[in-house]
């Protein structure tokens, strides 16, 4: 879903060499000096972070561990990510729920206070502007996080519609949380590690839940969510306390939770079958085509009321022409835009994300194929650098998710 490798333009589960980094810098920025830095930048460098340009920021792609080692350690122990390049914001006012429901497909009104959900911002044609995790803090306060590469576009979209909504008497305002940083603690040790740093009982906080609590002396927005398929948390912390909190988390884990970069984050989300905006979802792809119909609330399916509802509800009723699928493939890992063919060699779609799975020890990917050819077990071919390799459609997630839910 989230924090995707938007500016890089393709999955980066492979390790980037210096020549790759220089190419990206030349493509997107005049120099390294143009890049924004999170408050943890010096902390990353001091801990061996290999910094690369991403969505206007200098971010760690990996640390001393290889991407494969970091991926496996997250599954077995835990990982700490700096995701402060993402944009957190709050919507407030008695009409904030009604306002947001004009822009997203979720049943925001149906969320209980202190709970949240993945949703999709849509355009007039039903395409995805961005995906986001939203939380209903109270009936008059919504907290959400949008992707770094979509920040300017998303904020302009929200502001445009907010002006029109307020002009009609709607009560809604917003605040962009630039004063906060965002950490993601993921993996089987996430809960026990964080519990050492707060007096709040986290054992009753389940996947999707939200709290505002004290963690290691800081007032934090805590959401039990993540982008890895593992149990974990996203922690919005005042920026002046972010480095100290990161150090405290690593210390309490006794070295088992490790700093992890964008490379492993990408392989983790791919193994979990999660969309990467800019690859697996774009403005011409609807939530139905992306396999996110489950994120469209039942009430919203009945009532509509969001941008592009006519297109999306018709697809739910009639079925979409294309569908996102999971892929296994032979040969080298498939990359974004690799052609997918049927057994007769006819084009039926393309790969949107792909790479080698550190946990499965095989090539995995996602892509879009014509409806009817989307069923698991369907044999197909994938064209990689001019050569054709055998592949097949498979169910997702590739690696079972381990979200913390009530027994």
From Swiss-Prot:
InterPro entries: GCS_T, GCST_C, GCV_T_N, GcvT/YgfZ/DmdA, GcvT/YgfZ_C, TrmE/GcvT_dom1. One of its GO terms (biological process) is glycine catabolic process. One of its GO terms (molecular function) is transaminase activity. Pfam families: GCV_T (PF01571), GCV_T_C (PF08669). Its EC number is 2.1.2.10. GO terms for cellular component: glycine cleavage complex; mitochondrion. Substrate binds at residues 234, 265, 403. It is found in: Mitochondrion. Its main location: mitochondrion. It catalyses: N(6)-[(R)-S(8)-aminomethyldihydrolipoyl]-L-lysyl-[protein] + (6S)-5,6,7,8-tetrahydrofolate = N(6)-[(R)-dihydrolipoyl]-L-lysyl-[protein] + (6R)-5,10-methylene-5,6,7,8-tetrahydrofolate + NH4(+). Keywords: Aminotransferase, Mitochondrion, Transferase, Transit peptide. It is an enzyme of class 2 (transferase). Residues 1-29 form a transit peptide. The glycine cleavage system is composed of four proteins: P, T, L and H. The glycine cleavage system catalyzes the degradation of glycine. Belongs to the GcvT family. This is Aminomethyltransferase, mitochondrial.
């Amino acid at each position: 879903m989230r924090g995707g490798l938007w500016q890089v333009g393709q999955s980066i589960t492979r390790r980037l060499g210096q020549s790759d980094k220089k190419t990206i810098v030349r493509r997107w920025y005049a120099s390294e000096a143009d890049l924004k830095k999170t408050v943890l930048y010096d902390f990353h460098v001091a801990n061996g972070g290999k910094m690369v340009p991403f969505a206007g920021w200098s971010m760690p792609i990996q640390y001393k561990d290889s991407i494969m080692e970091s991926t496996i350690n997250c599954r077995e122990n835990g990982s700490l990510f700096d995701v402060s390049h993402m944009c957190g914001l709050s919507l407030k006012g008695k009409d904030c729920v009604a306002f947001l429901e004009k822009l997203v497909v979720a049943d925001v009104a149906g969320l209980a206070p202190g709970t949240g959900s993945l949703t999709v911002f849509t355009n007039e044609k039903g395409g995805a502007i961005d995906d986001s995790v939203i939380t209903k803090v109270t009936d008059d306060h919504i907290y959400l996080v949008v992707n770094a590469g979509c920040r300017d576009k998303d904020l302009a979209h929200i502001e445009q519609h907010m002006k029109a909504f307020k002009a009609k008497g709607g009560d809604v305002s917003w605040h962009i949380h630039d004063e906060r940083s965002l950490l993601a603690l993921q993996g089987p040790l996430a809960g026990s590690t964080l519990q050492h740093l707060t007096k709040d009982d986290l054992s009753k906080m389940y996947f999707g839940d939200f709290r505002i609590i004290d963690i290691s002396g800081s007032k934090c927005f805590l959401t039990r969510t993540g982008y890895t398929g593992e149990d974990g948390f996203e922690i919005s912390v005042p920026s002046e306390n972010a480095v100290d909190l990161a150090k405290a988390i690593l210390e309490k884990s006794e070295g088992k939770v490790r700093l992890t970069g964008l490379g492993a984050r990408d392989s983790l989300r791919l193994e979990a079958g999660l969309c990467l905006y800019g690859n697996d979802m774009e403005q011409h792809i609807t939530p139905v085509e992306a396999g996110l119909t489950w994120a469209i609330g039942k009430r919203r399916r009945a009532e509509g009321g969001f941008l592009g509802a006519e297109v999306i509800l018709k697809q739910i009723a009639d079925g979409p022409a294309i569908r996102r699928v999971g892929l296994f493939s032979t040969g080298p890992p498939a990359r974004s835009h690799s052609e997918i063919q049927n057994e007769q060699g006819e084009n039926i779609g393309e790969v949107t994300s792909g790479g080698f799975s550190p946990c499965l020890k095989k090539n995995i990917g996602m892509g879009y194929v014509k409806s009817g050819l989307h069923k698991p077990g369907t044999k197909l071919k994938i064209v990689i650098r001019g050569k054709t390799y055998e592949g097949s459609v498979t169910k997702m997630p590739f690696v079972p998710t381990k979200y913390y839910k009530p027994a």
